[in-house]
Curated annotation (Swiss-Prot):
Organism phylogeny: Eukaryota, Metazoa, Ecdysozoa, Arthropoda, Hexapoda
UniProt family annotation: Belongs to the NCBP1 family.
GO MF term set: mRNA binding; RNA cap binding
Main subcellular localisation: nucleus
SMART domains in UniProt: MIF4G
Gene Ontology CC terms: nuclear cap binding complex; nucleus; postsynaptic cytosol; presynaptic cytosol
Annotated organism of origin: Drosophila sechellia (Fruit fly)
Pfam family, one: MIF4G
Protein purpose: Component of the cap-binding complex (CBC), which binds cotranscriptionally to the 5'-cap of pre-mRNAs and is involved in various processes such as pre-mRNA splicing and RNA-mediated gene silencing (RNAi). The CBC complex is involved in miRNA-mediated RNA interference via its interaction with Ars2 and is required for primary microRNAs (miRNAs) processing. Also involved in innate immunity via the short interfering RNAs (siRNAs) processing machinery by restricting the viral RNA production.
Residue span, MIF4G domain: 31-243
Protein name, UniProt field: Nuclear cap-binding protein subunit 1
Residues that bear Phosphothreonine: T9
GO BP terms, alphabetized: 7-methylguanosine mRNA capping; mRNA export from nucleus; negative regulation of viral genome replication; nuclear-transcribed mRNA catabolic process, nonsense-mediated decay; primary miRNA processing; regulatory ncRNA-mediated post-transcriptional gene silencing; RNA splicing; siRNA processing
Quaternary structure annotation from Swiss-Prot or TrEMBL: Component of the nuclear cap-binding complex (CBC), a heterodimer composed of Cbp80 and Cbp20 that interacts with m7GpppG-capped RNA.
Length: 800
């Protein structure tokens, strides 16, 4: 072969590769353009939704031959990820089906596959949106009404399953009910008797289901002025109202009505038989909730009316607003802008709807979806974007919450405190405090003065003491926090009579001269174990006076800031560990922190958090200290429960971390063994990558990890047993004493305490659930007072 010929061949090869790359690039550009067109269809533009759809159908129809799979994937993704545009995309699919029946069938198959996969993978929202999309395709003459009703009936069959959690049955009923607003009218016109039969089956189920969980999830214990309805009961009432109105709703846009003459000529597809996957123990279903209500039409000024609590429009509006928050919560400015750009804002009092939905998220039980500060920051952005109206609505909401606070759930009380203090800090702490003057005459444990006091404590964390003092009217003097300074007893006037004063002064000099931990130990060694303690807690197993002198002196020297305190603790970590060998000694350390910093709640919180991180004190010691007699006067203060919850969370995170590490190690071991076995069987022509020793944990390592996890589980169980046992003891004692004295046990103290018990159950429900049978056997037995036992039974019912 000549050189010339070889050269030509090389050029041809190069041109071929270049043309192939160009085709790939061009295809990618077309795919990107198609995706952009599909994603943006129906959004604000100079032309109507209908003309947008017509233009897009023409484009997609031309590209179906080449980009069929891509178009199928994009449309099915939009159905799940953009439920607010459901009817736009169903109309698009309907028009494509009218032009290309085969593509319509392929899309239905694709959506069915998405729906089944979502159910199998426990992606419950995705499954619900897929079902809604399939249902709306009935309106577009893509799917037959008969086959949809068969699917809905199959889903309602789950409500008759035995030995499965009620939350599973509830979800399938909820999924069907929440789909009916889209397709109810069409089913009513075409298959009225079948629809009525379906509704009757739902009603039978709803009438017999247990609602033991209801009270645990309420924001308020009182139903005045707005009932706190369980979510399925509320939706069922809304669906019944919709049925009374002949399934005519006024909220859902239905662009397919314009194309009815085209769509009604299209051939329909039948859904295949879809059987919901059976229940497995590892399936987690959405927990029940209570529908939050703050406003009704009387709260809103002149303008559009707020839809009634049982109108389906209220459900649809709230669901849409919740979805906006879910989509944009990572970026507060975008979230606020999207909420205020709600497409139907001229038909409703939008500011009231938004504020109600944001507080519904914040007060959601057992825990909010996102951090408290997420909702606070969104509300701030809303006030900035809509300064003429939204601050007034928010002030009105705050007043409503404050006036109803005496029946508010304890967890929601905490969140209200956190939100309001944060909000004030962003608006120069401006509030009409004079309007709340009259509530200062109430007992200090009453929720209203308690709320004001806790808000001021939180404001102190976000500002400084002098600012808080200056901003408050003089009538609030008794609620203003104490000046946050350490109370170092070895520098007080009475210090000369205290047994540890001399050593404390020596220690001050030594630490200021940058002594070593060993030198501190040397100074402390001469302190006698006299059994001295501020609470006589020493039984001789530890030297309480030595702990007293060391802890108070060191932390007083580090009192300038959190950083100074942390540095001091870290430097003398070994001394702390040596002194804190027993749980009693650890409680003594906590006692001294409280004695030194009783006027600075935040300092106590961060110091105890630091001691837990450094493993100087155990979680069980903190729990025991919180319930000790010394802390009786602090028992209803919010910071103490902040400490308990951070303690429990620390233990929970430790257990979760060990569990994750063990699972990962077991997976690696199993894969290594499997790979080794496959390599032996594999033919020599295909050599597999060898598993290195570093990749494969030994069985001994896995066994040690199992032992560590078992020990952590034991400690976690012990922590919960301590907490719940102490709650039972103090509540039982209160109830017995009230009965003996003939007094009403339902005091403010009792409501705070029973609320805190409920809070522990709900805030840590995932971890507590593991030990529910143990708790039932050892603590929450049938002979326990019904008031206490009911809290436990409500908790168990959440996932029953």
């Amino acid at each position: 072969m000549s050189r010339r010929r070889a050269h030509d061949t090389e050029d041809e090869g190069y041109d071929h590769r270049r043309n192939k790359r160009r085709r790939v690039s061009e295809n990618q550009e077309i795919e990107d353009r198609l995706e952009s067109l599909i994603l943006r269809v129906g959004e604000r533009s100079t032309s109507s939704v209908e003309s947008n759809l017509e233009g897009l159908v023409s484009v997609l129809e031309a590209d179906l031959g080449t980009f069929r799979l891509k178009i199928l994937r994009i449309l099915s993704d939009c159905a799940v990820r953009m439920p607010e545009k459901c009817t736009v995309y169903t109309t698009l699919v309907g028009l494509l089906n009218a032009k290309n029946y085969k593509f319509g069938g392929e899309f239905v198959d694709h959506m069915v596959k998405t729906f089944k996969e979502s159910l199998k993978m426990c992606r419950w929202d995705a499954a619900r949106y897929s079902l809604r999309f399939l249902a709306d395709l009935v309106n577009c003459h893509v799917i037959s009404a008969t086959s949809l009703l068969q699917l809905l009936d199959t889903m309602i069959d789950v409500s008759n399953e035995d030995t499965v959690p009620q939350v599973r049955r509830d979800w399938f009923v909820f999924a069907v009910l929440s789909t009916l607003p889209w397709v109810g009218r069409d089913l009513y016109e075409k298959k009225e008797s079948a629809l009525e039969s379906l509704l009757l089956r739902i009603e039978v189920y709803l009438n017999k289901r247990s609602k033991k969980h209801h009270n645990a999830l309420r924001v308020w214990s009182s139903d005045a002025p707005h009932p706190q309805e369980e979510y399925l009961d509320c939706l069922w009432a809304q669906i019944r109202k919709l049925r009374q109105d002949n399934w005519a709703e006024k909220h859902i846009p239905r662009p397919y009505l314009v194309f009815d003459s085209i769509l009604c000529e299209a051939l329909q597809h039948n859904l295949p038989t879809i059987v919901p996957p059976p229940h497995h123990d590892n399936f987690e279903y959405p927990m029940p909730w209570v529908v939050y209500r703050m406003f009704d039409y009387t709260d809103c000024p002149d303008g559009p009316n707020l839809p009634g609590a049982h109108s389906i429009e209220r459900f649809l509006i709230e669901e849409h607003l919740h979805h906006i928050i879910e989509t944009y919560h990572h970026e507060r400015k975008d979230c606020a802008a999207q909420l205020l750009s709600f497409p139907y804002k001229h038909k409703i009092p939008l500011e009231y709807c938004i504020v109600e939905v944001v507080f519904a998220e914040l007060f959601h039980m057992p825990t909010p979806r996102y951090l408290d500060i997420c909702y606070g920051s969104i509300l701030i952005e809303l006030c900035k974007l809509q300064p003429a109206t939204l601050p007034q609505v928010l002030a009105q909401a705050t007043e409503i919450l404050f006036m109803r606070i005496d029946s508010m759930n304890t967890s929601c009380f905490d969140r209200f405190v956190n939100w309001f203090s944060y909000h004030l800090s962003n608006f120069k702490f401006t509030w009409s405090w004079d309007e709340w003057d009259s509530w200062l005459l109430l007992d200090g444990e009453h929720p209203r003065p308690k709320f004001i006091q806790e808000v001021l404590q939180k404001c102190l964390r976000l500002s400084y003491h002098q600012r808080i003092t200056e901003m408050m009217p003089t009538t609030y003097a008794k609620l203003i926090p104490l000046t946050p300074v350490p109370n170092y007893k070895y520098a007080n006037e009475e210090a000369a009579s205290l047994p540890g004063t001399t050593v404390a002064h020596q220690l001050v000099v030594a630490i200021r001269q940058k002594c070593t931990p060993e030198e501190v130990v040397n100074i402390l060694k001469d302190i006698p174990n006299s059994g001295y303690s501020g609470e006589e807690m020493s039984d001789g197993s530890f030297n309480a006076l030595k702990i007293d002198v060391f802890v108070q002196t060191l932390l007083n020297l580090g009192s300038k800031s959190f950083s100074h305190s942390f540095a001091a603790i870290s430097k003398f970590h070994s001394v702390f560990r040596a002194l804190a060998e027993t749980e009693e000694a650890q409680i003594c350390i906590l006692h001294n922190i409280f004695e030194l910093w009783s006027s600075h709640q935040q300092m106590m919180v961060v110091l105890i958090d630091k001691l837990l991180k450094l493993q100087i004190v155990d979680c069980s010691a903190v729990a025991t200290w919180i319930f000790s007699k010394e802390m009786t006067g602090e028992f209803t203060k919010l910071y103490l429960w902040e400490i308990l919850h951070l303690t429990i969370k620390k233990m929970n995170k430790h257990v979760i971390k060990l569990n994750s590490e063990l699972s990962e190690a077991k997976d690696k071991l199993a894969k290594a063994d499997s790979s080794s076995s496959d390599s032996e069987d594999d033919s020599s022509h295909k050599r597999k990558k060898p598993i290195t020793h570093a990749d494969k944990p030994s069985e001994e390592v896995v066994e040690r990890m199992e032992e560590k996890l078992e020990a952590a589980n034991v400690n976690q169980k012990r922590l919960f047993l301590i907490v719940f046992q102490r709650f039972i003891m103090i509540l039982s004692e209160h109830l017995l004493r009230s009965d003996t004295d003939g007094r009403d046990p339902d005091t403010d103290w009792y409501r705070w305490t029973i609320g805190r018990l409920q809070q522990v159950f709900l805030m840590h429900h995932e971890q507590v659930q593991k030990y529910s049978s143990t708790l039932e056997t050892l603590l929450f037995t049938s002979d326990l007072d019904t008031h206490i036992l009911e809290v436990f039974q409500q908790f168990v019912a959440l996932r029953a």
